[in-house]
């Protein structure tokens, strides 16, 4: 970016979540869609809860912008488990989509504000690592989850390949979200 204030905001948020870089976006939907695009290839498949914002409220942007399909998981109040992720990874078969990304919404809007425990996220991250999948956290209300579950921004940042954090929800800002990740990912996102 060209604006020194935005650059400083991106830098501070990246550091807050123990990542290298960040990208200011106009909305959470924009940040999530950029994350999906940067983590996937056309014809890949992403795993997410059936009530996740990326599926339920983002008008199939994943299909339009990234050319990917979704594997919907029936979590409990919007919270999925590592076992459910593992069960829904597509086998390596020529005419099946390649599973490449898991997306978690924390907190879960349609789940009534349910929050992931850090242990559950760690277990999902382990499955992702073992199966060469990326993990994105849609953190529209992530600051609420951090307070509710008493984990730190650094810890949640360590577990995710990317995160989106919304400023208009938990912080009451008029607009904006930040997409957070490593420097290579954010360069691709830009």
Q: Which positions does each model-derived feature cover?
A:
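Conserved PLP-enzyme active-site core in the AAT-like
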Residues: 1-190
């Amino acid at each position: 970016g060209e604006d020194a204030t935005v650059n400083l905001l991106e830098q501070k948020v990246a550091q807050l979540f123990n990542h290298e870089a960040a990208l200011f976006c106009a909305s959470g939907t924009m940040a999530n869609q950029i994350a999906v695009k940067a983590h996937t290839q056309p014809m890949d498949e992403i795993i997410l809860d059936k009530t996740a914002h990326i599926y339920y409220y983002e008008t199939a942007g994943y299909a339009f912008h990234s050319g990917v399909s979704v594997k919907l998981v029936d979590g409990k109040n919007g919270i999925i488990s590592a076992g459910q992720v593992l069960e829904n990874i597509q086998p390596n078969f020529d005419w099946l989509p390649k599973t490449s990304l898991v997306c978690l919404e924390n907190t879960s809007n349609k789940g009534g504000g349910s929050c992931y425990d850090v242990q559950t996220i760690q277990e999902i991250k382990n499955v992702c690592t073992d199966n060469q999948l990326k993990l994105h956290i849609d953190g529209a209300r992530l600051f609420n989850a951090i307070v509710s579950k008493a984990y730190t921004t650094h810890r949640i940042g360590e577990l995710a390949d990317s995160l989106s954090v919304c400023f208009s929800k938990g912080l009451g800002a008029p607009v904006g979200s930040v997409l957070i990740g490593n420097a290579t990912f954010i360069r691709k996102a830009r």
